[in-house]
């Protein structure tokens, strides 16, 4: 699982290293590499790529691409660790949106944990002059779109091959990126080409390691360890981009992680209790 967090953090580092390129151009190259990996994986698994739930797959691709685009915008314009922290709100939106899409319920105590997490975001915006309200809203919107995309993935998990779902996200991102890039194309130079490839490669590696961890470990444990990525974000931000953090901003990041982690732990325990009660245990 730690390999997954390192891989995703490295992908974010390379996004920031090519921040002089248009965000949609970065999306296009990221999805180009991802599409190649997915087709290879599907061919190896002897699975079809078209899918049978076209509407849900398309919507998953649209919301996933939108989330990715706005996340890249935040990474380009605010400190790396701050952008990653705001994106960590996505599980909260996933749970809230599931109330409407999947008819799931949220316990009262979970709302308290969500409030703790959002208060952390306000801390970051209030005490870090590099994080404007504009990019804060963009980051939150990215997390919201991720929440919608995750719910669509959950609705498809019993009906489509996982790589088919991922592939449609990559294809939508590739097509959208190509269209937008026609109007704002900027030729990458030198190391840019390598960085763009590594964005896609590390993102795909992160997904592979994450999937492997979910298959071997409890989902709650994986979710909690995933937030250790913030440590790598802080370290790489300081080492490569000379991004220091005030104590107040660090406190805000901790509040976000604590709020989300407590929500994950509580939700998993409630699910286990409900299963025991359902079986009469």
List each language-model region with its residue ranges:
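Glycine-/small-residue-enriched transmembrane alpha-helix faces in small-molecule transporters
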Residues: 1-25, 130-155, 275-281
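Hydrophobic/small/kink-forming positions within alpha-helical transmembrane segments
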Residues: 5-9, 39, 61, 65-69, ...
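Alpha-helical transmembrane segments of compact multi-pass small-molecule transporters, enriched
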Residues: 33-37, 86-100, 115, 171-176, ...
């Amino acid at each position: 699982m730690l390999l997954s967090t390192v891989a995703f953090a490295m992908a974010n580092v390379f996004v920031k290293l090519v921040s002089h390129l248009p965000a949609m151009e970065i999306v296009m190259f990221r999805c180009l590499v991802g599409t190649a990996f997915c087709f290879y994986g599907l061919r190896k698994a002897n699975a079809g790529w078209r899918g049978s739930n076209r509407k849900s797959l398309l919507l998953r691709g649209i919301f996933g691409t939108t989330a990715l685009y706005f996340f890249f915008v935040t990474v380009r314009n605010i400190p790396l660790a701050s952008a990653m922290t705001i994106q960590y709100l996505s599980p909260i939106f996933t749970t809230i949106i599931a109330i409407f899409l999947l008819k799931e319920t949220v316990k009262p105590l979970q709302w308290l944990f969500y409030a703790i997490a959002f208060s952390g975001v306000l801390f970051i915006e209030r005490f870090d002059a590099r994080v404007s309200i504009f990019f804060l809203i963009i980051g939150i919107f990215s997390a919201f779109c991720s929440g919608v995309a995750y719910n669509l993935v959950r609705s498809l998990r019993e009906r489509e091959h996982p790589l088919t779902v991922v592939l449609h996200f990559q294809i939508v991102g590739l097509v959208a990126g190509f269209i937008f890039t026609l109007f704002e194309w900027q030729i990458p130079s030198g190391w840019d080409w390598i960085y763009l490839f590594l964005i896609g490669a590390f993102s795909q590696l992160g997904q592979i390691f994450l999937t492997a961890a979910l298959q071997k470990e409890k989902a709650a444990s994986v979710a909690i360890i995933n937030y250790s990525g913030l440590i790598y974000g802080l370290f790489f931000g300081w080492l490569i981009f000379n991004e220091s953090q005030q104590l107040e901003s660090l406190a805000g990041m901790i509040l976000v992680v604590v709020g989300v982690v407590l929500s994950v732990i509580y939700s998993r325990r409630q699910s286990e209790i409900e299963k025991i009660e359902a079986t009469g245990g």
